[in-house]
Amino acid sequence: MKAKLALSIIGLVLASLVAGCIGGGTQTQTQTQGKSIKVAILFDVGGRGDLSFNDMAYLGAERAKKELGVKIEYMTPKSKEDMVPLLEQLAKSKEYDLLVLVGFLWTTPLNEVADKYPDQKFALIDSTTGKVRPNEVDILFREQEVAALMGVIASGMAYELGGDTIGAVAGMDIPPLWKFHIGYLFGAKYFEKKTGKHVKLLWQYTGTFGDTQVGYNTAMQLLQQGAKVLYGLAGLTHVGMFDAVKDWNEQGRGKALAMGQDASQEWYAPKYIPISGAKRVDVAVYDAIKMVVDGTWKGGIITLGLKENGVGYWDLDGVKQFAEFAKEAGKLKDMTPDEVVEIVKQQREKYIKPYVWEIVNELAEKIKNGEIVFKTPKSHDEYEQIINELEKGNLNAALKKGSVE
């Protein structure tokens, strides 16, 4: 299947995101270059099947295999304790031109291994070791930017559902999730400031990215506390959140909606998931591989946000493409991709009103133009301080540059 994925606000994005990573030449020439390149994709402990982060990485690698002709192998450690031995084993083998490490949990293992094998190239996706090495590329995302937009959208939908409370089912208490938390709360308070409508956020860490039952139970608790919209930030775990929202509605316990993240997840329950945030893990993986194929590899840290088309939210073209992918994989059984799109379109029109889109677009422009730049907390204490200030309505506490009056 073609990975023709679309982002709202930013438009259709299939080209590379990382400046300088894409070299010239025809696809045939690139495929010839890539035939001798061997890459290992190392998922985090959640592995494939999360319909989100790891599956997006898989899509990027499969695109590289098809377009660049590289050989790809996939591996998932059984536990965090297995990560260093696995990484050491692969680096020592000298069998792979590139080891792509998917997710924050690989940060410490990479720091332990990278200097021992200076000739082995590593790409760390969604984290950084904090060290600049010639054999290491770290690709980060400015999660605050997508989460801020989703916070505005969630707040607007909550009011359409007759409430003022939004929630989030998050995975582990780690830096990428800190940024999501800051952005989501910022978006809610930005909505509050623009409309005068109070918004309450219920944020819950589950401690796992791979347990749907935990996601279900956590979501039910948040719904019982009054949350009208839940944002899934826990990989496979938040698939359980989707099930909880579906049951909540269909059992007549109240009205609630869910929002996905990373991949377009609307197809899973389009009546109850009108929108998903986008985090282009797929393109980050693809571009890391292409740097090796093209011979343009340069160690360092790359950060992607709205301006670089690295984050956003999925438009209806993206919804359809992922619904088609789900259909081909046998996961979408009860409707066609076109039916998914039609339901999502109707739900967006019903629950995301024009005034909300105006606020979203205004905020997105400020972010893309650099008028607003979010802080990235360097410690858990700083993260907590920012959250505490945001809860008081001090939006500027989250900003490195710019202000909200």
From Swiss-Prot:
Signal peptide per UniProt: 1-20
Annotated transmembrane regions: none
Chief subcellular location: membrane
Pfam entry (one): Bmp
Lipid moiety-binding region (S-archaeol cysteine): C21
N-acetylcysteine, modified sites: C21
Gene Ontology CC, one term: plasma membrane
Disulfide bonds listed in the record: none
Cellular compartment(s): Cell membrane
Keywords from the UniProt entry: Acetylation, Cell membrane, Lipoprotein, Membrane, Signal
Domain of life, source organism: Archaea
Bilayer topology term: Lipid-anchor
Record PANTHER family: ABC TRANSPORTER GUANOSINE-BINDING PROTEIN NUPN, TRANSCRIPTIONAL ACTIVATOR PROTEIN MED
Family: Belongs to the BMP lipoprotein family.
Protein name: Uncharacterized lipoprotein PH1714
Organism: Pyrococcus horikoshii (strain ATCC 700860 / DSM 12428 / JCM 9974 / NBRC 100139 / OT-3)
